[in-house]
């Protein structure tokens, strides 16, 4: 990003391990679809193998969603649902803290049935202090100045 500051969009897959229970995956997926979907980009991408229809009853999912005000609540609910108390995947949390948005979801059978989300992060929309943690203060300042942002 420092060598080529004209590029400010990052995109790629972020995975939810198939070891997560179905209820946890559905809760995470539902939260992402309702709160972090890149609606403007959805029409341009189609998953080869989209996740099947949810197995949770709509009423059950609705109750879980009402308890999930933000990502930390979702993570806590997932931890309660999982036998080993794992939470929302760490990499996914990091991308979401960078204001990442999901475009579509795909089940990757060649990777053990992982649930993959195609995520996009616009680095010009990341909090400058958080950006500095990745690019250094000087790097973040230089990057943002290139894009006419003044932190």
Positions of predicted regions on the chain:
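Terminal substrate-recognition subdomain of acyl/acetyltransferases
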Residues: 2-151
């Amino acid at each position: 990003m420092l060598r080529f500051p004209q590029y400010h969009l990052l995109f790629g897959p972020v995975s939810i391990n198939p070891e997560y229970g179905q209820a946890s995956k559905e809760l995470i997926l539902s939260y992402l679809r309702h709160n972090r979907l890149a609606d403007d980009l959805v029409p341009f991408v189609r998953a080869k193998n989209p996740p099947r229809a949810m197995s949770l009853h709509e009423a059950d999912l609705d109750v879980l969603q009402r308890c999930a005000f933000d990502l930390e609540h979702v993570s806590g609910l997932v931890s309660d649902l999982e036998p080993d108390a794992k939470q929302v995947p760490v990499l996914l949390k990091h991308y979401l803290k960078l204001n990442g948005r999901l475009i579509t979801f795909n089940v990757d059978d060649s990777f053990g049935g992982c649930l993959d989300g195609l995520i996009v992060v616009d680095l010009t929309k990341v909090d400058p202090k958080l950006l500095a943690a990745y690019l250094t203060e000087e790097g973040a300042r230089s990057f943002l100045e290139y894009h006419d942002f003044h932190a």
